[in-house]
Amino acid sequence: MQVQNIEGSLNASGLKFALVVSRFNDFIGQKLVEGAIDCIVRHGGSADEITVIRCPGAFELPSVTRKAMLSGKYDAIVTLGVIIRGSTPHFDVIAAEATKGIAQVGMEAAIPVSFGVLTTENLEQAIERAGTKAGNKGFDAALAAIEMANLYKQL
């Protein structure tokens, strides 16, 4: 008897993606979008198969992601956004609810939903994670979405 191994490939060819991105802190969010698009194209995907959907803020990401998932148009969804800690508890509430909501949509979805929302202590950390010192987390989230979309197709 042989053990069967199933895993996804990193080939984005023929896959359709929705990038759901919050506009708040857009100068950083746009860098995440650029990283995600770069990843998909580098892995054989086509820019014509990518739809960028913008919503006001991170709190709206789960509902917009759910709507995109229910449309049946996409093989995977990449959520992107930036939540930076301020001097009030607002950060904790928004970060927790956005994360929980996106995770819930991911559990309901028949397609993969990857998480590329930055939750940082300050602006410098956000900039570092959007394409400078710490890589681009949009790229990383898209890479996970590619692998998961191919994995889902095998299950």
UniProtKB/Swiss-Prot annotation:
Pathway: Cofactor biosynthesis; riboflavin biosynthesis; riboflavin from 2-hydroxy-3-oxobutyl phosphate and 5-amino-6-(D-ribitylamino)uracil: step 1/2. SUPFAM superfamilies: Lumazine synthase (SSF52121). Its EC number is 2.5.1.78. 5-amino-6-(D-ribitylamino)uracil binds at residues 24, 58-60, 82-84, 115. Catalyzes the formation of 6,7-dimethyl-8-ribityllumazine by condensation of 5-amino-6-(D-ribitylamino)uracil with 3,4-dihydroxy-2-butanone 4-phosphate. This is the penultimate step in the biosynthesis of riboflavin. HAMAP family: Lumazine_synth. This is 6,7-dimethyl-8-ribityllumazine synthase.
